[in-house]
Amino acid sequence: MPKNSKVVKRELDDEVIESVKDLLSNEDSADDAFKKSELIVDVPEEKDTDVVERSEVKDARPAWNSKLQYILAQVGFSVGLGNVWRFPYLCQKNGGGAYLLPYLILLLVIGIPLFFLELSVGQRIRRGSIGVWNYISPQLGGIGFASCVVCFFVALYYNVIIGWSLFYFSQSFQQPLPWDQCPLVKNASHTFVEPECEKSSATTYYWYREALNISTSISESGGLNWKMTICLLAAWVVVCLAMIKGIQSSGKIMYFSSLFPYVVLICFLIRALLLNGSVDGIRHMFTPELEIMLEPKVWREAAAQVFFALGLGFGGVIAFSSYNKRDNNCHFDAVLVSFINFFTSILATLVVFAVLGFKANVINEKCIAENSEMIIKLVKMGNISQDIIPHHINFSAITAEDYDLIYDIIQKVKEEEFPALHLNACQIEDELNKAVQGTGLAFIAFTEAMTHFPASPFWSVMFFLMLVNLGLGSMFGTIEGIITPVVDTFKVRKEILTVICCLLAFCIGLIFVQRSGNYFVTMFDDYSATLPLLIVVILENIAVSFVYGIDKFMEDLKDMLGFTPNRYYYYMWKYISPLMLLSLLIASIVNMGLSPPGYNAWMEDKASEKFLSYPTWGMVICISLMVLAILPIPVVFIIRRCNLIDDSSGNLASVTYKRGRVLKEPVNLEGDDASLIHGKISSEMSSPNFGKNIYRKQSGSPTLDTAPNGRYGIGYLMADMPDMPESDL
């Protein structure tokens, strides 16, 4: 193309090259210039194709070795610790079996459509979260940065939980288990049971004192817990080694880390069903309380669980799907992974309540034995008449039914004096109604249940190895949500970035392995992700449905999948999902405002938990976590809206596209026109120096409403987009 070629008007079906700097500018003057300017380029179609083909051969983006590996990676990321220790708690708390109906409805309304959306944009644009949202709308490019920040915050404390699991795993190779009984304290005169343990339980004591060595408040740091520091280091080393070689390495690990938890859950379920009382737990779990289902709180908690169970907004879903082939059926993947996640939660719920049913039965038998002895003592002391005890009852082999009968009789006969007798009802339902979740379920309730298992060390090893694998699967996706977009955007070496990221996270994570570290884990879990992720996903939905255009997006899906997705998704993305997400955001803000910010501190002298409010500096950290997570969104918007950064200097808003694919930036636009048109890429293009950029318009494509900026969308770019090599992104 001659250097002195002039800009003239042509018909819409002519071949055109446009400047991305003009297209990405949101100022009216730039838009007017775009509307009036087109460059005449007469280029044979086959030569342009040669450019793409040769470039793709030279620079290929890493890809999954197989479809199974990819599915396992997505399953490993979405199926995490929350499926085991959060979903069963919510199910029990919110009406048992009745909770499954609102959860399933919201999975169809929010979960699958938004999961499908993230898979689609990642696979179509083939970049991480930063590149995807910057590509769709530069002014909303901060969404990707916000996702990275949230991923980093979550990774900080999530790996601490993996460290805890590693500690318990390492301590499980003992018979008996170290948390089976309370330790004895010896002094010069006599031996006695540790008072803190005697007031609570052996498993509770082991968790708070032996494992965490916890302080009494968040203000009392107490120094580092060296045992947990080593475990945290080991967890980060495992994550770093798995991620450092990219998806080829982490993908292979997924074969074990994603499948092993299912083996353990099935083994636990079979073993638990053979134990006495397991059926009571499952029956209690799925006894529906339909009246609870109508409460708004149930729907809010179900929506939040659906939202976080699938890992929406983290960027890991987008990062994993960006390594797929362009024609992969991501709709099938979205439905498959979503229902695998759902049925995993059901399986985990069956296991949890079968085990807790057994535990409740053991505790109930112990309660009956202790209270029977107390009744015998009261009879001998004359406080209870022997005549009111039925003659057929044998206290040496008393059943639960016999004890219930005696308890009711004594309660009626000694109505006024009954409270002073200190007898317990010993009901299995009372024990099952003690809802536990999170660390309380995994490290206290479940560990206590396993002490009553035959061959308890074996089951303990299996259980905590399962937790480690569940955690690692989610961690791989979380770290991928940081690494992939940064590598795609800034062209740094993945190995170096991975090591730096893991090393930095370990250093910051030392605050979680202080004696007060558990309180910081609670703080980060409550404030670093919930609201920021909701805002991120709402903006993702808006960016695709309204900024880019839902109609063009549906056309892109048709081109990519080979069929038009059901119209159901059109209405979900455009109307229902945004309204549901906005309602969930408002409800979460209201709930956060009504709930006093604080944490449950362990009181050593009382051997019980006590709710404490965060100190002033703690509140500052809570607010800072939320602000820092969403801060990139308005910052990037203002920078791009006000043109505070010169696109020619090489920033994220300036990217070169050609026939729907990203090209390396020519150093000199005019000097490189001829080589680009004739199918040659100069050696100078290897440097991603973003400056003047060019577009080539396909014949027959629409005009302004298909331009590649936030206002006009990117329809024609995505309509014929070949696989984009990572080096070209």
Curated annotation (Swiss-Prot):
Keywords: Amino-acid transport, Glycoprotein, Ion transport, Membrane, Neurotransmitter transport, Phosphoprotein, Sodium, Sodium transport, Symport, Transmembrane, Transmembrane helix, Transport
A GO cellular-component term linked to this record: plasma membrane
Function of the molecule: Functions as a sodium-dependent neutral amino acid transporter. Exhibits preference for the branched-chain amino acids, particularly leucine, valine and isoleucine and methionine. Can also transport low-affinity substrates such as alanine, phenylalanine, glutamine and pipecolic acid. Mediates the saturable, pH-sensitive and electrogenic cotransport of proline and sodium ions with a stoichiometry of 1:1. May have a role as transporter for neurotransmitter precursors into neurons. In contrast to other members of the neurotransmitter transporter family, does not appear to be chloride-dependent.
Domain of life assignment: Eukaryota
Compartments, as annotated in UniProt: Membrane
Record-linked NCBIfam families: Na_transp (NF037979)
Name of the molecule in the record: Sodium-dependent neutral amino acid transporter B(0)AT2
Segments traversing the membrane: 70-90, 98-117, 142-162, 226-244, 253-270, 306-323, 335-356, 453-472, 496-514, 530-550, 571-592, 620-642
